[in-house]
Amino acid sequence: DFKCPSEWYAYDQHCYRIIN
């Protein structure tokens, strides 16, 4: 599986940071 750091989510094999 494609994994991202904590607080990030994966989409299309890229990581995006969750902005609050």
UniProtKB/Swiss-Prot annotation:
Additional record remark: Negative results: does not agglutinate fixed platelets.
GO MF terms held by the record: toxin activity
Q: Where in the cell is it found?
A: Secreted
**Which family does the record claim for this protein?**
Belongs to the snaclec family.
The cellular component terms of Gene Ontology attached to this UniProt record, alphabetical and capped at eight, are: extracellular region
**What does UniProt note about where in the body, tissue by tissue, this protein is expressed?**
Expressed by the venom gland.
Protein's recorded name: Snaclec ophioluxin subunit alpha
UniProt keywords, alphabetically: Disulfide bond, Hemostasis impairing toxin, Platelet aggregation activating toxin, Secreted, Toxin
Q: Where is the C-type lectin domain?
A: 11-20
Q: How does it assemble?
A: Heterodimer of subunits alpha and beta; disulfide-linked.
Q: What does this protein do?
A: Binds to the platelet and collagen receptor glycoprotein VI (GP6) and activates platelet aggregation.
Which residues pair up as cystines? C4-C15
Say which species the protein is native to.
Ophiophagus hannah
